Amino acid sequence: IDENRLYVTGGSGGGVLTCWMIGRTTRFRAAVTVYPVINWYSFVLYSDIPWTANYWFPGMPWDNVELYESKSLLSVVKNVKTPTMVLTGEADYRTPMPDSEQYYAALQLLGVESVLVRVPDEPHGISVRPSHHISKLKHIMGWINKYNNE
């Protein structure tokens, strides 16, 4: 394994883990986070599956503000140095676009090289239209290849 050519990507829960990793290490040359949950506090309020937070958190966010905030990826975004692509479907009600927009905005404010890719009319998974699924894969590989050739 060439430790100078490590990349990370993941979608949904894997997107959460991608953001978690790049918020804790600089070992990756580039990252692509696909439809991640960024802010657990707001996830409970606008996701189509808000009850799932009960499996991971005791009580509602307003009763456990510090805990929800500490687990939200905005709490570690200040550490990110890895060039990052954020990719989400605009019709995603599982991990809605505002989470990706928040994360991208934070990366931009921090000066991290980043791009936000919005896929129109796509829900969670970005696979309703085959062309969108192919586009998702091309975006991921394009971002990784950009840093593979440096």
Where are these regions (language model features)?
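Active-site-proximal cap/loop segments of hydrolase catalytic domains
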Residues: 1-150
